[in-house]
Amino acid sequence: MRTRGKAPVLVLGVGNALLRDDGVGLRLLSDLSPEGRSWDAEIEFLDGGTQGLALLGRIAGRRALLILDAVNLGAAPGTVHVLREWRDCAARSATAHESNVSELLAVSTLLGECPEKVAIVGIEPHRIATGMELSDPVARALPAALEAARGLLLELTEAAVPEVERGRKPVDSFGPMVIPFGMR
């Protein structure tokens, strides 16, 4: 079931590709979305760039949100962070941009529009400076971050879009199968 005509799950890549490691969220999004994988049609991939609060309307009405970003928590550069509860990092201004993701999520919560499930996969940046190449530690962390993002995306999709809504019978269910309207 789509909410307000939107896919229930949004994968949001954020950052500035012109500031080296700050663009890692966009790189993760690019590597995740077109990889030839048959992702569920209930998922939308969005390059949020540096739009900040302008993204409020894009996340409103979703059931789940996976954010891909540079995350600065003071760990070693290239450390992959998987944050299943965004409020844990909100006070630390975790993202590497001025208009950060925590602010976006806090405002959407105040407006009653924050998705029920929000997770963040990010990589600790090494160098935020003019340039388009990722630093070596961040580039080396991409495969691990992609693996974490894939796993979380599957988890979020299962939580946000139950199988019966997708017209499939759950494996562990012995109840009647739900047949989508028009398929009888």
Residue locations for each model-derived region?
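Phosphate-binding/catalytic loops
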Residues: 101-184
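Nucleotide and nucleotide-moiety/phosphate-recognizing core
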Residues: 2-12, 17-88, 160
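Residue-level signal for pocket-adjacent positions within structured domains
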Residues: 13-14, 75-78, 96, 123, ...
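Conserved active-site and cofactor/substrate-binding residues in soluble primary-metabolism enzymes
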Residues: 23, 27, 50, 96-102, ...
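Helix-loop-strand module that forms the ligand-binding subsite of alpha/beta enzymes
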Residues: 70-118
